[in-house]
Amino acid sequence: MVAITLPDGSVKNFEGNTTVMEVAQSIGTGLAKATVAGRVDGQLVDAHDPIAHDAKVEIVTPKDDDGVDIIRHSCAHLLGHAVKQLYPDVKMVIGPVIDDGFYYDIYSETPFTPEHMAAIEKRMMELIKQDYDVIKKITPRAEVIRIFEERGEEYKLKLINDMPGEEAFGLYHHQEYVDMCRGPHVPNTRFLKVFKLTKMSGAYWRGDAKNEQLQRIYGTAWADKKDLKAYIQRIEEAEKRDHRKIGKALNLFHMQEQAPGMVFWHANGWTIYQVLEQYMRKVQHDNGYEEIKTPQIVDRSLWERSGHWGNYATNMFTTSSENRDYAVKPMNCPCHVQVFNQGLKSYRDLPLRMAEFGSCHRNEPSGSLHGLMRVRGFTQDDAHIFCTQSQIQQEVADFIKLTLAVYEDFGFDKIIMKLSTRPEKRVGSDESWDFAEKALADALDSSGLDWAYLPGEGAFYGPKIEFSLKDSLGRVWQCGTIQVDPNMPERLDAEFVNEQNEREVPIMLHRAILGSFERFIGILIENYAGWMPVWLAPQQVVVMNITDKQADACENVVNELKKAGLRAISDLRNEKIGFKIREKTLERIPYMLVLGDKEVESGSINVRTREGENLGVMSVAEFITLVEAAVAEKGRQIPKIDQE
């Protein structure tokens, strides 16, 4: 007899082994039809996996987040089924679930085209209509190897070879197609009707550019058509907001092949960058940070001592001169320790907070580069706090408050905070990890906000907190971080004199709020769709004349605005005023001032906004006060962006 406890506390008894599907059928046929999988004692399982002991069981349906993820994973297998039917010579690699969808990496001698993707999607729909059952079989290792050898699936064999301890594998059978997976998966293809293939890209086997290139097909899948439609609308809106398109349209920046992953900032984009830097400089100064500047090219010996040369060399740009090897710094931390080491510090000097707008370079694979979001050359709002163990909690709590306040200034009020704890491979004692993790957890608790654990995701040297922003499209961007590191200061001989007059190694807190300026500006462009808040707008005001007679008056107004610290330009072209207003609206300039004969005669200006609102006639002084108030609001009032 197997006793099954349901979420409401009721108990159902079954003679012998049972399954999640049988439990669902005992509750009702409607629930059984909706059953995607189950959770047995908290563990996700397939609907037909045997349950041989008393257990707590939850039914997973498409209404659950887990259910949607399972649908997406099964769609990846369905994609594999369709691809192998259409193109039997290709080799299947991996097909995981990702945010809002799935992908499959495939090795093919012939590059896939949009026409191929359309054919694959059509075949997937045809397979779904066949309404076949997805069969799971736990298969011995030798048999799995034989199956994939017969099918010529060399990448599956490599994956099996990566798991020498596995004696059996779960094989999922989609009719004649077989894929290997831990599961769970849907019991039948009827659950997979609401899907769409979305795009293709390149990828490398194991993510290494030295390996062969693969082709990646992305897709999305949902529980119902309404959710899919909403997702497609979000994707279409995201495409409109693509920072690369807007960057070109607003003359902010460009990238070119001669400098892959490096940004050519134009005057408009560089203005945004400078405003951001000046803002962060003031924030850090006001919160007790001292700003420093360290070299970009540093001798190999420092990177060897820090551990970067051994663990990170493939991501570093290197050079040599006079028989010495150097690296362009990929991060700032070892250099900051060198500054700390100049002169013996006392416990009275701690905490010592060092900030740098550090220019870093990382040799990212060319296939992974993506506008401002993934670059090779970038600047971080980087800082390191040298402190004692007892100071960790307060420093982290202060940093959390500061970080949330900064995000609020940019209009981000949905912040996700996660604490990444000790990984299996790590340095340091369990006691030091216990202390550091508790200090971070207590600091998070003191914020009064929700947060979650990410077990095993910490760095090898210490735990960390990650801050992710949710933008206006609901997308999540990981930006800020603070990491506890007792390891690097020790490797680089950092010491201070403690209260007992003994030498002690300080704790180093690595922290950033924005992450990289380049990526954060890309996020801002897409979040605002280019309609930057007044304080960030490259040009805040444009002054326009109706006829040539008002040209001098326009220039006088521009000069007055500039003296007040506003970013102002004039448009004195011999064009109709309506045309000029439309053009400057497309340039997203927040305020447009129009001067005709009446305004010149009265010494006033006619003010309208890029959203089309007419603010009427006012004096220049009144207008300056208005703009200063808007600047003070920063990004808390997101501009209307329905003028696309």
Curated annotation (Swiss-Prot):
Q: Where is the TGS domain?
A: 1-61
Task: Identify the cofactor(s).
Answer: Zn(2+)
Instruction: State the residue spans of region: Catalytic.
Output: 242-533
Where does the UniProt annotation locate this protein? Cytoplasm
Q: Which GO terms describe its cellular component?
A: cytosol
Which free-text remark accompanies the cofactor? Binds 1 zinc ion per subunit.
Molecular functions per Gene Ontology: ATP binding; metal ion binding; threonine-tRNA ligase activity; tRNA binding
Q: What is its EC number?
A: 6.1.1.3
Give residues annotated as binding Zn(2+): 333, 384, 510
The EC category is: ligase
Keywords, in A-Z order: Aminoacyl-tRNA synthetase, ATP-binding, Cytoplasm, Ligase, Metal-binding, Nucleotide-binding, Protein biosynthesis, RNA-binding, tRNA-binding, Zinc
Keyword ATP-binding attached: yes
**Catalytic activity from the UniProt record:** tRNA(Thr) + L-threonine + ATP = L-threonyl-tRNA(Thr) + AMP + diphosphate + H(+)
Keyword check for ATP-binding:
yes
GO BP terms: namely: threonyl-tRNA aminoacylation
By sequence similarity, the record places it as follows: Belongs to the class-II aminoacyl-tRNA synthetase family.
The record's subunit annotation is: Homodimer.
Q: What is the role of the protein in this entry?
A: Catalyzes the attachment of threonine to tRNA(Thr) in a two-step reaction: L-threonine is first activated by ATP to form Thr-AMP and then transferred to the acceptor end of tRNA(Thr). Also edits incorrectly charged L-seryl-tRNA(Thr).
PANTHER family tied to this protein: THREONINE--TRNA LIGASE, CHLOROPLASTIC_MITOCHONDRIAL 2, THREONINE-TRNA LIGASE
By what name is this protein known? Threonine--tRNA ligase
